[in-house]
Amino acid sequence: MKNLLRALISQGIEALRANGTLPADSLPPDFVVERPKTRDHGDFATNAAMLLAKAARSNPRALAQALVEALPRSEDVSKVEIAGPGFINFYLAPAAYQREAASVIKEGHDYGRNLSGNGRTVGVEYVSANPTGPLHVGHGRAAAIGDCVARVLDANGWNAKREFYYNDAGVQIENLSLSVQARVKGIAPDQDGWPEGGYRGEYIADVARAYMAGASVDLEGTLVVGAKDAKDMQAIRRFAVAYLRNEQNLDLAAFGVDFDIYFLESSLYADGKVAEAVAKLQASGHTYEEGGALWLRSTDFGDDKDRVMRKSDGTFTYFVPDVAYHLSKWQRGYERAITELGADHHGSLARVRAGLQAMEVGIPQGWPEYVLHQMVTVMRGGEEVKLSKRAGSYFTLRDLIEEAGRDATRWFLIARKPDSQLTFDIDLARQQSNDNPVFYVQYAHARVCSLLRQAQEKGLVYEQGNGLANLGRLSDDASLLLMNEISRYPEVVEAAGVALEPHLVAQYLRELAHAFHTWYHGTPVLVDDSADRNAKLTLACAARQVLANGLELLGVSAPEKM
């Protein structure tokens, strides 16, 4: 409906140009059509007249009056008013909302989706956990946010490629290997011989036992077998990484998260991508030698200080493979690249972008885009559940899913803006009450399914065609409020895609569920009059469809029974 109003306003502006009220060469303003905070100010409002007033050399209210008079007539608009300094408020006719409800039924799963991305490719990288242990709840938030961002982008017409980057070539992998080797030798944490910086969780003992038992791990089609040799560090490293990568994959699968691409940091070295990145940076003239190290003059590109690329001992800093990895994304045709990271990685953003700009290979400024998430605090029984991988006090994503369930875990982890601190209340997530938002939303969907079953049990045949033809009967306030809420869904999908904020979908679904439950409690649905009954069931089915569409964007199920 916003598009309809934008079209009407644009036609009105053209009419003002034609009659000389506006200069013929004035540029069309980038006006806003939005829903007011309260419905007392109409269903939609625009600032178009205020933006045009200067070009027209007119008082904004006077120009607003002229624009209102120039608007084409539309049966979807019942009233237009001028408010404040020159806002124009639109009141929609019931027929507009009734037609929107019908569109939901006709479009089904596609309702709310758009083609703004035009099929272009966007790479979405998320989780990217080191393969050194099970996924913790922070990784879970990254997985939920990243997966939902990709789903929302798909709904906005983009071709989202989901990518997991494994840091399998750093110091952490060496510490992992030494930790497993110590366990293989029977050395426990805090005993003599335990490696400094070793991983202390009980899962290390699990890896060691599997390695010495000759267990096999099928990792994406490659079989890795425990060599049972306590001295073979290469074999231990290979098995430990494969074992823990597989464990992470199992957790992600249970969480409903999958990836198109698993990219290994080690492949950047093996395939010469790190060397290529260094060569491009040196060729661009933005590097220099100092103190036996190779530096990038990243301050030329907005970084707060220059960065070491190659240390005096000949090894590369983490910065170099990060830049090489993002260069590979550009070379693979990602018009957009989005990386979801914990907020503690904020310091790496400027240096990666600086490195990419310094290559001078055509990568635009602001590429890649970043979505940063804050920490998660998990509460149970009013007390915080501590998370500490290195100390071994380890509450994992798997633990959380087992306690709260997949749907509640996904919902709660994306329910707030990513850069907001998040408290996950396990007790609330397990409740089957209206206080639990995911239960409240899912129950609205199940309630419509129950209505249809009740109709069938009573021998009342639901005729969708008859319901569509009689939606005009539903002009009471509760029905129109529900239709109004339903009609917001395409705007929410678009806004979530632009802002990369899937929590907007969760917030909307809760508001839609509230509108539906309110309508349901105040509206007899299975009435004797078949036309009224079919119309009400059709409206209920429209609400159900939008609930299902939105829940799918969040990776949450839409149950038919609860």
From Swiss-Prot:
SMART domains for the chain: Arg_tRNA_synt_N (SM01016), DALR_1 (SM00836)
InterPro entries: aa-tRNA-synth_I_CS, Arg-tRNA-ligase, Arg-tRNA-synth_N, Arg-tRNA-synth_N_sf, ArgRS_core, DALR_anticod-bd, Rossmann-like_a/b/a_fold, tRNAsynth_Ia_anticodon-bd
GO cellular component, one term: cytoplasm
Domain of life of the source: Bacteria
Enzyme Commission number(s) from the entry: 6.1.1.19
EC category: ligase
Pfam family, one: tRNA-synt_1d
SUPFAM superfamilies in UniProt: Anticodon-binding domain of a subclass of class I aminoacyl-tRNA synthetases, Arginyl-tRNA synthetase (ArgRS), N-terminal 'additional' domain, Nucleotidylyl transferase
Localisation per UniProt entry: Cytoplasm
Keywords, sorted A to Z: Aminoacyl-tRNA synthetase, ATP-binding, Cytoplasm, Ligase, Nucleotide-binding, Protein biosynthesis
GO biological process, one term: arginyl-tRNA aminoacylation
One MF term in the entry's GO annotations: ATP binding
PROSITE patterns: AA_TRNA_LIGASE_I (PS00178)
Motif ('HIGH' region) on chain: 129-139
Catalysed reaction equations from the record: tRNA(Arg) + L-arginine + ATP = L-arginyl-tRNA(Arg) + AMP + diphosphate
Cross-referenced CDD domains: Anticodon_Ia_Arg (cd07956), ArgRS_core (cd00671)
Disulfide links within the chain: none
Subunit relationships: Monomer.
Family recorded in the similarity comment: Belongs to the class-I aminoacyl-tRNA synthetase family.
Protein name, per record: Arginine--tRNA ligase
Source organism of this protein record: Stenotrophomonas maltophilia (strain R551-3)
Lineage summary: Bacteria, Pseudomonadati, Pseudomonadota, Gammaproteobacteria, Lysobacterales
